Amino acid sequence: MQTTFVKNDAKVIKSWAMFDWANSSYSLVISSAIFPTYFLSVTNATIHVGNTDMPNSSYFSFIISLAYVFVAIGLPILSGIADYSGKRLYFLRLFTIIGSLACISMYFFRDMNTLWIGTVGFMLASIGFTSSLVFYNSYLPVIATEDKYDKTSARGFAYGYVGSVILLIVNLFVIEKK
């Protein structure tokens, strides 16, 4: 089913920008500022994987890389399917839900006993976040005319910055109180 929108509709553009408000928080808080530090603080300095011992920072880099290998292999295929079948919104929802549930699961990552939760949660969150962006970005030409691309995109970008900074401040405040 193909979803149609009236181009340059203020409500639709605001909704599109609010998606950026929400998803940009992931890239700042989870990928960059809070989770990497948390991961290194609750894991052993050396993590045993198969027959190999590796520093926890290398393990963290490895799980990020593995997530993006899945994205690099899968997304060209899925975006082609979405374009051909008109299921762009389906994939946007699917990957947003995957990323959201994976972020929720990361709450239960406390120490080495729950390393698998942190690993799987972070990988799925990264896959969900990155994949949802592909389908989110594909909506720009659907919701705006070409002369409004820059303004619409900048609005989403600005909302994303504001939303992510607000969440980072809240998170830092909560961490400081503990």
Q: Model-predicted segments: where are they?
A:
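C-terminal ends and interior cores of transmembrane alpha-helices
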Residues: A72, R93-N113
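Short, surface-exposed linear patches
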Residues: F39-S41, I104, T114-L115, G128, ...
